[in-house]
C-alpha cells in the first residue's frame, strides 16, 4: 500500500492522499471535505468532555499537505465549521494556519454546519452551493450537473475491513461521483458497501478497490 494513489477520472488525473485529501495536479488544487473546525469546542460548551488539540492537529496535517504538494489553492467541500462560534481556540489555530499560507487561495463550498461561516471573517471565498470546474462539479452534498462528475463530502464514507482494523475512512469512487472522507479525525462515518468502488485510508496508506469509471494511472 502507498501514501498516494493516482487515478484517471473523466480524462483528468486525480491523486488520492492517505491523509484524507484529494489533489488535482492540473490545477495544483488540494481538496478536502468536512474539516469541522471547533467541533471539540462545541462539545465542551455543551458539557461533553473531549480532549483538546484536535483542531490544531487537523490544521497541522493540512499544512503539511499544502507544502508537500505545492498547492496553489485549497477547496473545502463543506462543513468547514461545526455550528455556532462558541469558542476562540479553533479560531487561533485557523488564524495561524492562514498566516502560514497567506498566498493560498481558499474556496469553501458551504455545508449544513456552516451557518456561521459568512460572519466568521476567515479570509476565504465562500460558494453557497456548488462550483463547476469542468469536468467536475464541487459541492458539499453530491450534486447532479449534466456532463460533470460530482466531487463532494458530507457522507463521511467508511468501509469495513476487519483484517485491517475494522471500519476505516475511504473515498467513495463511482462512475458519476467521488465522495471524500471527512478530513477531521473527530467524526463518525457512513458505511460504503464492500462491492462499491472505494479507496480506503488505512494507517497512513491507501488500499484501492476501483469502480469501473475510474482507472489507475
Feature-to-residue mapping (PLM):
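Extended recognition/assembly regions associated with phosphoester-bond processing machinery
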Residues: 1-217
